Amino acid sequence: MAIPVNVKKWIDENREYFLPPVCNKLMQNHQLKVMFVGGPNQRKDYHIEEGEELFYQVQGDMCLKIVENGKHKDVHIKEGEMFLLPGRIPHSPQRYADTVGLVFERRRLDTEKDGLRYYVEGTTEVLFEKWFYCEDLGTQLAPIMKEFFSSEQYKSGKPDPAQPIGKMPFFLNTEQVMEPFSFQNWLNKHRLEINQKKRVSLFGHNQETKAVVYGSGESKDSKAQTDTWIWQLEGTSCVTLGNEVLKLGSGDSLLIPEKSLYSWIREDCSIALSTSQVPA
């Protein structure tokens, strides 16, 4: 049964999970993972996955450390900013106290592998890494980190010749990442276009992340091939899902399960963000 969730209220009710040692809480955990992350959480490990990740800073700033084309780079995502990280780029989120960030990622395909990697300090030489099929990142990372901290590589700060780094299951992405941008400024700039076209994509059609802002209008008998998360930003709308009629007010969210048939009526002055991730 689909149930609308008010985002602000949900964040306030779950703030205890945004503190160490947990630092995150999943709002939705299906084909689409919708999670909120807090801090402080400073880390040395880098995560690598084949899919994209979408970041939006709800409260406070964060720094996303990445390795872009063989060079370390800090991507500073400020409060209210959005950033789409392409797949296959090593990344290490650095979060601070009293911050809350929204992160989207998707369920992995059966053929996909995730990696956890540590670098030799100050370089891009791989010190230690493990590849695994990701089912629950929150529980799977801890044993790998524990293995690293008890390893010869951690003690010496150098790769262990007895444990050579194996071949990666895929090539790293060589594209240059985008600059984070203010979501509110984007909305203000595109309001006229949203009113005229009824829907405007944030990232175009070449990415697996489909983030679309909808204005007033109606979507009849739509088929959700993957999970779709709706966030009603302004005004109201009404979603008919099976025999259920669900009303969304400002700040409410709703997950439409994959392979569902639904209709969506958006009233005048309605602004809503629809997010889904379709594996490439």
Swiss-Prot record:
It is an enzyme of class 1 (oxidoreductase). One of its GO terms (cellular component) is cytosol. It is found in: Cytoplasm, Cytosol. Disulfide bonds: none annotated. It catalyses: 3-hydroxyanthranilate + O2 = (2Z,4Z)-2-amino-3-carboxymuconate 6-semialdehyde. Catalyzes the oxidative ring opening of 3-hydroxyanthranilate to 2-amino-3-carboxymuconate semialdehyde, which spontaneously cyclizes to quinolinate. This is 3-hydroxyanthranilate 3,4-dioxygenase. The lineage of its organism: Eukaryota, Metazoa, Chordata, Craniata, Vertebrata.
